[in-house]
Amino acid sequence: MSNRMSQSLNEEDPQIAEAIANEERRQHEGLELIASENFVSEAVLQAAGSVFTNKYAEGYPGKRYYGGCEYADVVENLARDRAKELFGAEHANVQPHSGSSANMEAYGAILQPGDTILGLNLAHGGHLTHGHPLNFSGKTYKIVPYGVTKETETIDYDELEKLALEHHPKVIVGGGSAYPRIFDFKRMREIADKAGALFMVDMAHFAGLVAGGAHPSPVPHAHVVTTTTHKTLRGPRAGMILSKQEFAAAIDKVTFPGMQGGPLVHIIAAKAVCFKEAMEPSFKDYANQVVANAKVLAQSLADQGFRIISGGTDTHLMLIDVFAAGMLGSEAEKALGEAGITVNKNAIPFDTNPPMKPSGVRIGTPALTTRGMKEPEMRQVGIWIAESLRHRTDPDFLGRVRRQVHELCDAYPLYPERRATRLATV
C-alpha cells in the first residue's frame, strides 16, 4: 500500500482538515435552530465514514450486478427491515440519495409526465418538489397548489377538497418544509378517495416525530410515503420511500435502474444505524421533548412580542413574522448569526417580499434537543433571539449574546470525545 493510503487527513489535505475542524467548532459553539438540521450520533458518523464507501452494489439484495456484495446485502436488508418495523410499512426502499430523489422516484412510479399533482403551495409551507415551477416537479407535471387560510394560516381542507374534485389530480401530496401544524392525514385520504386520486405524504420534516410517537403517522393512510433520514430522524443526509406492497415493484424499478445507479452503501449502513437508534425507548423521550421545546420556544417569542405564524406549533418548527417587527428575514438571519444563533430566512403565507428577502424566519428545535436542552433553555433562547433582533445593528450587544450562547453550548457539549481528541493533538 502506498504511503498516501495511510496518511491522515491532516497530512494529506490540511485545508480540508481545517475546514472540517472549523465546522465542528461552529456546530459546538452555536445554537443550531435550522429546522432541517440535527446532530447524528457517533455510531452514525462511523457507519457513514466506513469502508462501504468503496463498494459498488447496483441492484437489490440477492439481485446485484456486481460480485462481492454479500455484506452490502446484510446492510441493506437490515435497513429495509428496520424501516418497515419502525414505521409499520409494507415496503421500504432505502436507496434514494435524498428527499428530493425519493420524491422524484415516487412520482415516477405512480405518475406519467403531464399528470396532475395537488400539492401544498411552497409559499404556504410546501416544498420545491411538490410543484414549484422551477423544480423538476413543476416542469414535468401539471401542478394545482392548495394553501392555508389568511385567518388561521392553517390548511383550508374545504378548498383542498374543492380543488381535488374540480381538477381530479392523479396524486394529492401532504407534507411540507415550513408548515408548523399537523396534517389531517385521515381527511386528506378521504378527499383523495373521493377524487379518485392516490395519496402521498412527504414526511421528511417530521419522520423522527412519527418514529418517536410524538406525531401521527401518515403510513396507515397514504399509498406512498417519502422522507429524508436526517432532520428529526437524526440519521445521515439521505432519503427513503415507504409504500403499500402494491407499489413496491414500480418504486424499486424506478429507483434502480430508472433514476439511480449504484446505491451509497455506506450511507445505507448509517440509515440502518439511525433506524435502530429510533427504536430505542430514549428516542420516544427525544421526540416528545423536541415538540415540547418547540412549543415553549414559540411561546417565549410570542411573549417577547413576535407574531408566530398560525399562532404556534404542533411540531418541531415554527415560523416567525419578523417583517411585522420592522425587519426582513434576511436581516434577522444575519443578526442572529452574529449572535451565535443559526436560523434561516423563510417566506410566510401571503408574503409580498421576494424569496431572498422574505418576511419571516424558520426556527426548529431538533438539534438543541439532541444536545440535551429542555424547556428552561428554550425560554432563555427565546429571550436571546428577541433581544438580538431588537439590537440587530449593535455589534457589541450581539457579541455579548454570542459569549452567553457559547457558555450555554459548553454546558451541553457536542461530540465531547471527538473534541477532546482533537484538542489533545493541537
From Swiss-Prot:
Organism: Koribacter versatilis (strain Ellin345)
Protein's gene: glyA
Pfam family name, one: SHMT
Enzyme class, spelled out: transferase
Keyword Amino-acid biosynthesis part of the UniProt annotation: yes
GO biological process: glycine biosynthetic process from serine; tetrahydrofolate interconversion
Record's subcellular location: Cytoplasm
Annotated transmembrane regions: none
Quaternary structure, from the entry: Homodimer.
Protein name: Serine hydroxymethyltransferase
Sites bearing N6-(pyridoxal phosphate)lysine, chain numbering: K231
SUPFAM superfamilies per the UniProt record, alphabetical: PLP-dependent transferases
Similarity comment text for this entry: Belongs to the SHMT family.
Record Gene3D superfamilies: Aspartate Aminotransferase, domain 1, Type I PLP-dependent aspartate aminotransferase-like (Major domain)
Reactions it catalyzes: (6R)-5,10-methylene-5,6,7,8-tetrahydrofolate + glycine + H2O = (6S)-5,6,7,8-tetrahydrofolate + L-serine
Any one Gene Ontology molecular-function term assigned to this protein's record: glycine hydroxymethyltransferase activity
